[in-house]
Every structure is written in C-alpha cells, then in structure tokens.
Amino acid sequence: YRLKLSTVRGGLRSLATWLFDEDSPATPELVEEFVAACRSRLASGMSPSPRTDELVSVLGEKHPGDPGIIVAFLMNPVSLRPGEAVYIPPRQIHAYQSGLGIEVMASSDNVVRAGLTGKYVDSAQLVEITEFSALPPVRVAPEHPSATTDRFLAPAQEFELSVTTLAPGK
C-alpha cells in the first residue's frame, strides 16, 4: 500500500484514510503486529524513539487492535508539568494519555474521535475535517497579573484561562 508522500500533509491524510477505511487491510491483527514490532525494538534496546514505542505498547494493552494506536505513533508527544499549557490549533488530532488537564475549546457539538475509545469513530468525517500538518507543540507560558493568579493566553484571541490559587481558609 503506497502513500502519496509528495507532501507530509498528503501522506498523513492518505495514511488516515487507509487506516480508517472500513475496507482497509489495517485489521486488528495488523495493528497488533505493529505493536509487537514496537515492543521488540524496546526489548532489544534498538528503538529510535523509546518514549513513542512505550506509548504504543501501553496503548496496545489498553486498546488492542485499535488503528488509533498507529495515529498516536505519528503524533508529537508532549509532557506537561503542573502549571504548564500547550495550544493545539483547530482541526488537529490531539489526545492525552494520562494525568489531569483542562481542555478549553470553542463551543461545539462536533467532537470527532480518531480511536482509542469505545465510542463511535466517524472516520469519513475525521479525514474530511482534520488539518493534517506536522506542527511543533505551541507551549503557552502563564502571565502573572497578581500574586495568586496565573493567566494563560492562547494564540487564538477567544481563548484565555485564569487560575487563581487561594490561601487555605480564604
């Protein structure tokens, strides 16, 4: 199966179309072979990206055979510490593996899933609306308008998050 790799965007769109097409040969067994290959690289110490291969291994346990595992393999892994933020532009596939976070997004009734869920995945809609671009993460540093408040301003004007920490008993 050849991907049109004339551009990254075209290649990623072709891959997503191939993965999520209901007639695709990307069967659960093929996904399991992919997971096994990542685990083998980890075990041999030959992984070019241990963090990504470990993610694939964990997702393979949680969501066996799910084509979303291959999508996760292609994503930029980002770790956030408490008090850190990242901005994801609209129409970009994103996910979190673990931890607690706040997601601020535009009012919408069209959450489209790319896998790793027991919920419905509308693959045709996913491929149609997703902007397949290889983008670096955009970290958002907080401003400190007061001693007790951090304010996160996203590159999109309509998004702002303020976190105020009160002293105990206040």
Describe each region flagged by the PLM.
Residues 86, 102, 159-162:
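A broad, low-specificity signal marking well-ordered, structured residues that form hydrophobic/aromatic
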Residues 54-82:
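Conserved AWS/pre-SET-to-SET junction and N-terminal core of the SET lysine methyltransferase domain
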Residues 75, 139-170:
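A short glycine-rich, His/Asp/Glu-containing loop-to-beta-strand
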Residues 79-98:
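Conserved metal-binding segment of the jelly-roll/cupin
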Residues 99-151:
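C-terminal, non-catalytic macromolecule-binding modules
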Residues 1-59:
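Long, charge-rich alpha-helical interaction segments
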Residues 41-60, 126, 131-144:
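Long, charged amphipathic helices and adjacent flexible linkers at domain junctions
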Residues 62, 79, 107, 164-165, ...:
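Short, conserved beta-strand element in jelly-roll/cupin
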